[in-house]
């Protein structure tokens, strides 16, 4: 085992394959995790069973790590995490392409194409999500940059602002037609009425699931840690996020 761990290149992905209860975690991953901690490297763990957290929390604290936990299964023992913080940071730095790339990745997590038959709904919902987020980055206050605001934007968007326009069309009509916010959202607000209503419904569904729970909405509205700390300080971050992420 020691020889195997020494051969692992930490700059590359490692896939450990084996049957259930074959000892993958105890025999390979836990020893590798020990080595990472002993080398004072930062760790991010998607820990659905909380086995890493339960086994390594005390060791991480003793080694001087800051431990942050995003746990949507146990809301009373979770730090806050706003998934829009990072793209918003890059947007404010003038790196709009980077912000849009991150938002697009997040959108495809929210709206996966499970059947991989017709990617239309996944792609158009992601585009609307990206467009709304970029519009929020441009016009919103910092405390409004969260998934709750995106959901509100969608639910209000189909309401009539006038006899001929809804609020979604009215709002984006004020935007530069060459802007990324306008282009991404235009696939929806320029669509026929029935198609537009279907897109809004599909886009709203996973967001409503998140923000419909007051405590979850609160946790996802404000980060209680600086994401820069993941590279600048010794940190262990554990995620237990069912369903969407």
What residues fall within each predicted segment?
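P-loop NTPase motor domains
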Residues: 4-245
């Amino acid at each position: 085992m020691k020889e195997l761990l020494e051969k692992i290149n930490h700059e590359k992905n490692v896939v450990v394959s084996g049957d259930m209860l074959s000892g993958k975690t105890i025999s390979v991953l836990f020893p590798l995790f020990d080595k990472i901690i002993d080398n004072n490297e930062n760790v991010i763990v998607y820990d659905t069973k909380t086995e890493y957290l339960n086994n390594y929390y005390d060791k991480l604290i003793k080694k001087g790590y800051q431990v942050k936990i995003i746990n949507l299964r146990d809301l009373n023992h979770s730090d806050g995490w706003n998934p829009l913080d990072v793209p918003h940071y890059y947007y404010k730095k003038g790196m709009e392409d980077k912000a849009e790339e991150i938002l697009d990745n997040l959108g495809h997590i929210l709206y996966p194409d499970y059947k991989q038959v017709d990617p239309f709904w996944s792609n158009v919902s992601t585009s609307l999500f990206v467009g709304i987020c970029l519009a929020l980055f441009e016009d919103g206050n910092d405390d409004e940059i969260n998934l709750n605001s995106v959901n509100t934007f969608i639910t209000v968007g189909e309401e009539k602002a006038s006899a001929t326009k809804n609020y979604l069309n009215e709002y984006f009509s004020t935007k530069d037609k060459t802007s990324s916010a306008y282009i991404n959202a235009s696939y929806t607000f320029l669509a026929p009425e029935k198609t537009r209503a279907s897109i809004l419904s599909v886009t709203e569904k996973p967001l409503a699931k998140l923000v419909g729970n007051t405590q979850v909405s609160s946790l996802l509205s404000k980060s209680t840690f600086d994401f820069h700390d993941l590279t600048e300080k010794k940190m262990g971050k554990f995620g237990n996020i069912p369903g969407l992420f």
